[in-house]
Curated annotation (Swiss-Prot):
The active site is at 142, 174. Iridoid synthase that catalyzes the first step in generation of the iridoid ring scaffold using the linear monoterpene (6E)-8-oxogeranial as substrate. Iridoids comprise a large family of distinctive bicyclic monoterpenes that possess a wide range of pharmacological activities, including anticancer, anti-inflammatory, antifungal and antibacterial activities. It catalyses: (S)-8-oxocitronellyl enol + NADP(+) = (6E)-8-oxogeranial + NADPH + H(+); (S)-8-oxocitronellyl enol + NAD(+) = (6E)-8-oxogeranial + NADH + H(+). Substrate binds at residues 142, 174, 350. One of its GO terms (biological process) is monoterpene biosynthetic process. Its EC number is 1.3.1.122. Keywords: NADP, Oxidoreductase. InterPro entries: NAD(P)-bd_dom_sf (IPR036291), PRISE-like_Rossmann-fold (IPR055222). It holds the Pfam family PRISE. This is (S)-8-oxocitronellyl enol synthase CYC1. One of its GO terms (molecular function) is oxidoreductase activity, acting on the CH-CH group of donors. PANTHER family: 3-OXO-DELTA(4,5)-STEROID 5-BETA-REDUCTASE. The keyword Zinc does not apply.
Length: 389
């Protein structure tokens, strides 16, 4: 059974500390280690059976290391990669890096800032790491849909999305990152690259700007605390469609495994790949699971019912969340960190966003996830980390 197949079936190994290794087969640098996929990479890369290993892992993030990330056996580096000076000072000394996993963004659509961040990392690492072999970057399905603003006037591609679809005529920092990656990799002999375009990500990170499971879980927790039903917010003009439409997602661990595959498998070099769990679901199924997990009454889509966005419904709930944190002795967090209402509202307006993943299969990646099980898994992860009760 392959490593990827075993992990898809839940047969992954736990990390066990067996003393410090004196040599490593690979050295990974994760940029954005406290993000939703960076956190998964930090957990999976150091495992004893991870392909390409044993791995030494550096993890880079702008903020101090959070408590929920400290159990990963990595070397944490606090560095603002938007600052050229800070990036050169912190990353240039890392001369043993063999692989870069770039899973960072600014939290805005600003092409220039995101381009600068990526350039800074490459300028610090490539000239100083003679054994650098591969660079992974993560983008996403905005490559096929255009900007997050659903009223932006950009006509998205029809789904299922395939990697050979042309770029849309709209500013998108994904394009900038891809162009920089290909150009810079071509300058160094033997340096390969891969681009990963995941679907909606199911994962865990209180610092992620696009954490759908985090937002929905916090919403359910607040509903339970206030003894109110869990009301599907939907969208004013397409609630029925968003409730019933087929959707897909990509488990954060699966995305990490996908990037590790591309980093070590010759069939994946210098290619672009979509990534998703390999199944589809309807949001009405996920909301039922959400209500069951938090033991709250579900009010789903109903004809004629007035819709209210989560941003509106959760306005002013910061003190309520503070009370919940105190009551259940959770890790101290602010509501705006753990719940991104704007993103949950955008997801509820999304329709027919399905990633085709045949290219990954044809090149040898057979990993998958059951999306319903993945949804529950990440809720349990958040509970175990004391982010939610």
């Amino acid at each position: 059974m392959s490593w990827w197949w075993a992990r898809s079936l839940g047969a992954q190994k736990e990390f066990k500390e067996n003393g410090a290794l004196t040599s490593y087969q690979s050295v990974g640098l994760i940029i954005g280690v406290t993000g939703i996929v960076g956190n998964s990479l930090a957990e999976i890369l150091p495992l004893p059976d991870t392909p390409g290993g044993p791995w030494k892992v550096y993890g880079v993030a702008r903020r101090p290391r959070p408590a929920w990330n400290t159990d990963h056996p990595i070397e944490y580096i606090q560095c603002d990669v938007a600052s050229t000076e800070d990036t050169l000072a912190k990353l240039s000394p890392l001369t043993n890096i063999t692989h870069i996993f770039y899973v960072a963004w600014t939290g805005s659509e600003d092409c220039e800032v995101n381009e600068t961040m990526f350039h800074n990392v490459l300028k610090a690492v490539i000239p100083n790491a003679p054994n650098l072999r591969h660079i992974c970057i993560q983008t996403g399905i905005k490559h096929y849909t255009g900007p997050l603003d659903p009223d932006g006037g950009i006509q998205p591609h029809d789904s299922p999305f395939t990697e050979d679809l042309p770029r849309l005529n709209a500013p998108n920092f994904y394009h900038n990152l891809e162009d920089i990656l290909i150009e810079e990799a071509a300058k160094k002999k033997g340096l390969t690259w891969s681009v990963h375009r995941p679907a909606l990500v199911f994962g865990f990170s209180p610092y992620s700007m696009m954490n759908i499971i985090g937002a929905l879980s916090v919403y359910a927790v607040i509903c339970k605390h206030e003894n109110k039903p869990l009301i599907y917010h939907g969208a004013p003009d397409n609630s029925r469609d968003s409730w019933n439409v087929y959707a897909d997602a990509a488990d954060a661990d699966l995305i990490a495994e996908h990037q590790i595959w591309a980093a070590v498998d010759s069939n994946a070099k210098n290619e672009v790949f979509n990534c998703s769990n390999g199944d589809v679901f309807k949001w009405k199924q996920m909301w039922k699971i959400l209500a069951e997990q938090f033991e709250v009454e579900l009010v789903g889509y109903e004809d004629g019912q007035k819709r209210m966005s989560l941003q509106e419904r959760m306005k002013g709930k910061g003190p309520v969340w503070d009370e919940i944190v105190r009551k259940h002795k959770l890790l101290p967090t602010k509501l705006e960190d753990v719940a991104q209402w704007w993103f949950a509202d955008i997801v509820s307006q999304s329709q027919n966003l399905v990633n085709g993943v045949n290219k990954s299969k044809e090149n040898g990646f057979l990993g998958f996830r059951d999306s319903k099980k993945s949804f529950v898994y990440w809720i349990k992860k958040m509970r175990a980390a004391k982010i939610i009760p």
